[in-house]
């Protein structure tokens, strides 16, 4: 994916998580303006921070695409003096999304700044690494035939390749969502990796 603009570090962290989350196809910033009437019947408008389109899986089989409109806010803002105004906006956004078969969600630092973010930050730099096609094929076929394995076992079984090269190729494949590991844990040589269907 390309660059998605963000207005705060929390928004940047949200994008980082979504970029590595399984099934996320689209991350759009400030996608649409929603018009609504407030309780004084004044026309107001509200622009969600992001539109996410993700593929939903059931028993590892992709079933449908889901659209989610997202607001990213610190808890202090959600509970601050603007809280009543925000709640009003969010209610209208929720109704607006529901009528169209979509979802609206609010993410705070509690949902964003988690171990999933630390893993995503670890993997992000590997996304743009050039692939080592020979090694990628060897790793994928090893996991396809042998099931989930610790990265150190993958390194041992592919002993004809330097182990640091195997490790960085595994990181690149994880960063590009070609293979899976625990989304809440940093990746080490003791991490279990697998094809998505075995995850």
Give names to the regions the model predicted.
Residues 1-199:
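Electrostatic, structured charged patches in enzyme active sites and in nucleic-acid/phosphate-binding
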């Amino acid at each position: 994916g390309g660059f998605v603009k963000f207005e705060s570090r929390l928004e940047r962290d949200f994008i980082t998580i979504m970029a590595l989350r399984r099934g996320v196809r689209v991350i759009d910033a400030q996608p649409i303006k929603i018009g609504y009437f407030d309780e004084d019947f004044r026309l107001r408008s509200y622009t969600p921070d992001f539109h996410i389109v993700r593929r939903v899986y059931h028993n590892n089989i992709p079933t449908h695409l889901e659209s989610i409109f997202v607001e990213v806010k610190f808890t202090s803002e959600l509970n601050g003096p603007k809280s009543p105004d925000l709640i009003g906006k969010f209610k209208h956004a929720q109704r607006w999304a529901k009528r169209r078969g979509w979802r609206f969600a609010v993410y705070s630092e509690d949902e964003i700044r988690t171990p999933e973010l630390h893993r995503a930050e670890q993997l992000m730099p590997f996304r743009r690494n050039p692939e080592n096609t020979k090694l990628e094929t060897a790793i994928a076929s090893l996991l396809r035939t042998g099931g989930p394995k610790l990265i150190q076992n993958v390194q041992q079984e592919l002993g004809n390749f330097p182990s640091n090269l195997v490790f960085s190729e595994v990181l690149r494949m994880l960063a590009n969502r070609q293979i899976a590991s625990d989304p809440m844990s940093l990746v080490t040589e003791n991490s279990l990796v697998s094809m998505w269907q075995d995850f």
